[in-house]
């Protein structure tokens, strides 16, 4: 990674955690490591990102899907990021292809429930801790 203000190469190990996701995505695309029809799995990609950058990341992921035909499987605990995905999917006219699942704890396991038609269940759960304050 190059910082124009410093004119020095910044080693990946010295980058902030938030910057690393953008760098990895850029490298995967520029190296042609991802091909149409591939599945990119990203685990909580919004971690260490300011909410504004979460929106930017959501748009990048939606564009990777829309323009490159690469499927994205992401999990998140961020209502900002999830909402940004919903909004950007609509903006890029691919909202009908998006699916949203919520993991619910049962007595012995977690059960995945499709909440695409009512994502409020996700937001209710994510905002629940605020009610404890």
For every predicted segment, state its role:
Residues 2-131:
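Switch/communication elements of ASCE P-loop NTPase nucleotide-binding domains
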């Amino acid at each position: 990674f190059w910082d124009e203000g410093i004119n020095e190469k910044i080693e990946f190990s010295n980058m902030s955690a938030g910057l690393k996701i953008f760098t990895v995505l850029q490298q995967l695309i520029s190296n042609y490591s991802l091909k149409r029809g591939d599945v990119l799995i990203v685990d909580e990609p919004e971690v260490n990102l300011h909410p504004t950058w979460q929106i930017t990341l959501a748009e990048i992921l939606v564009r990777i899907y829309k323009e490159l035909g690469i499927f994205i499987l992401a999990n998140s605990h961020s209502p900002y990021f999830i909402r940004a995905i919903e909004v950007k999917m609509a903006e890029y006219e691919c909202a009908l292809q998006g699916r949203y699942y919520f993991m619910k704890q049962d007595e012995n396991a977690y059960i995945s429930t499709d909440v695409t038609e009512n994502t409020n269940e996700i937001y209710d759960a994510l905002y629940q801790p605020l009610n404890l304050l």
